Amino acid sequence: MRKRTLVSVLFLFSLLFLLPDQGRKLHANAEESSDDVTDPPKVEEKIGGHGGLSTDSDVVHRESESMSKKTLRSNAEKFEFQAEVSRLMDIIINSLYSNKDIFLRELISNASDALDKIRFLALTDKDVLGEGDTAKLEIQIKLDKAKKILSIRDRGIGMTKEDLIKNLGTIAKSGTSAFVEKMQSSGDLNLIGQFGVGFYSAYLVADYIEVISKHNDDSQYVWESKANGKFAVSEDTWNEPLGRGTEIRLHLRDEAGEYLEESKLKELVKRYSEFINFPISLWASKEVETEVPVEEDESADEETETTSTEEEKEEDAEEEDGEKKQKTKKVKETVYEWELLNDVKAIWLRSPKEVTEEEYTKFYHSLSKDFTDEKPMAWSHFNAEGDVEFKAVLYVPPKAPHDLYESYYNSNKANLKLYVRRVFISDEFDELLPKYLSFLKGLVDSDTLPLNVSREMLQQHSSLKTIKKKLIRKALDMIRKLAEEDPDEIHDDEKKDVEKSGENDEKKGQYTKFWNEFGKSVKLGIIEDAANRNRLAKLLRFETTKSDGKLTSLDQYIKRMKKSQKDIFYITGSSKEQLEKSPFLERLIKKGYEVIFFTDPVDEYLMQYLMDYEDKKFQNVSKEGLKVGKDSKDKELKEAFKELTKWWKGNLASENVDDVKISNRLADTPCVVVTSKFGWSANMERIMQSQTLSDANKQAYMRGKRVLEINPRHPIIKELKDRIASDPEDESVKETAQLMYQTALIESGFILTDPKDFAARIYNSVKSGLNISPDAVADEEIEAAEEPETSEATETKSDDLAGGLNIEAEPVEQQEENTKDEL
């Protein structure tokens, strides 16, 4: 009985479905036979599933079959674009936009404009917002994979019929621009306009576009175009009323299928529109587990005949009594709901006093995509006012990227992002921060920055220069403040008070950490940025002969200078350990002078640009011109060693030695070699010789003249003076003088051009010390006679020979002995 009832019910349902289907077929046949496309009938069905474009609160109906053909409606008013479409599309596709992704940025930007407008009007008239869902200021994105439609909807001010014709039918005309002209004296409109062609970027991915819009002062209209030179506008009588706002439907090209993926849309919103003022939501899918009733298996009907009558009766009785408990099971089900995509708050719009440290840290991790637990070393949040207004947040990362300096001049670091009214513009340009500050991460949001027709190509405008100047100053102030707040940077006379207070414990050692990570960038800034050279010099840190392994600054160095000291002394080399043993420091250290150690290769270039600081000149102690006070015996010593210096200079004429002088920098070493004031130091020569593409001719020119300085108090120099006085032609004295010069070259950090000659002189000196004749040579090697063949082979041959001649073979040793006897 139950089986027959079920069959009857199914038959009735099939009849109900067949009747509407016949109606649809008749309607389709009528369309095919008609030359003109008729308006689609109004559809009352709500679409809330994955393929639909509506929800319970926001219902938009599917298109009719005629719309799927992407043809203009027959009853619509037809217009032609005022600009040639071929030229328009050429500008949009080929000239303005380097990638298709930004179409979504442009449409969301326009939606934000519309929301800004209605919000501004609502300040004086709250009724313009309406009620319910219409009053929500939001942007919604939906996709229909089956029909390849992407929809972007806003609840903004909307457009009238006239607005649609004027703003979307004319190139370089923007509703926002007109609105600004109308309201510019009423306050801050906070609009993103000025373009007029942003909407047309949608044709990069779509070949047919519908714009459905409803303004409070007009009916709902549809604008549609295939970008073939024509567009149409008609009153909308078939779509669900929007209430207020605009919906743009993009019928995507076949090659633009990637924009029907939820992940792609999320990525684009995250990249370009993350900080738009209004919520941006995507109708997204997700899997959830739900409990559903366990349905009877299809095989249950087949097994009914075999079940016992008693079981059927019992089952019927249970059903009648309602005592049967329904079984359920868990299944995975795909559901759709609105997912908020821009949940990161734009903290730079708030006052810095209102933002907590935790919020700054969280925003840094979101901005930099660095999701470690490390906090940024420092940050600067500020608002700039004046001719160019902008807001910015700058961060010093906790660590430097491993490849920060590997491709310094060729890299395009995406660390500073430019926004215009919360719309992402670009992160690949050098107009806002110089290369040496490229390690900073942050964001700049300008309200007044003028742009050209494309958001991707910034104009070379004075506004950019103004922003850059302010950003650099704020960045340097942030780094300077980091140093000032570090207890390790405080002078000794102030340390006791700080230690007692116990403040800034978290900031202890922070600037040392910064210097170890980014110190080279400060040095590069001194080289590249002449305008801020003095500010950057204050940020320099280095070790000295008196810093006990700690970093010190130029200001601290000057505070410790001797009263008679006029110059800032420094020395360059490959390591601190090497420099501490340098002969150039001997007399300076004994007299209590402090010398700066520069051990980074970039320091050589740095000191070519940093000539002075606070009216103090820099003096490389390995170059000529060092002044360390006057010695009362200087004139007397010069006169006493005049003959030696003159003789020595003559003997070194072939060695590119410009002069031989009495030294004022030596204490324990007999002599050193110094370079001319503007020539390369020994360390610079070493650096340049290691360059793969170095020019040998340029090296010879830049090497300059060398000066041999002798220590008149050293016993070797005194002895040479006496020897020269007695016999200036003594070959042994000449040999010793040459050896002394070569040794001084090595100790001064230079690389010998003829190490073989130097080695020969050393060996001769050793011979002399061991009382070995200078003419003594190594014994010649006695050439051994050619070794005979192996004994086994010889014995074998001897045995063969003996066997052949029937004689007894002699041992090999005996044969060799007999040969010697014969000789």
From Swiss-Prot:
CDD domains: HATPase_Hsp90-like. ATP binds at residues 106, 110, 154, 159, 167, 173-175, 194-199, 246. Residues 290-321, 777-792 have a biased composition (Acidic residues). The keyword Transcription regulation does not apply. Residues 39-48 have a biased composition (Basic and acidic residues). It is found in: Endoplasmic reticulum lumen. One of its GO terms (cellular component) is secretory vesicle. InterPro entries: HATPase_C_sf, Heat_shock_protein_90_CS, HSP90_C, Hsp90_fam, Hsp90_N, Ribosomal_Su5_D2-typ_SF. Induction: Seems inhibited by heat shock. Transmembrane segments: none annotated. A motif (Prevents secretion from ER) lies at residues 820-823. This is Endoplasmin homolog.
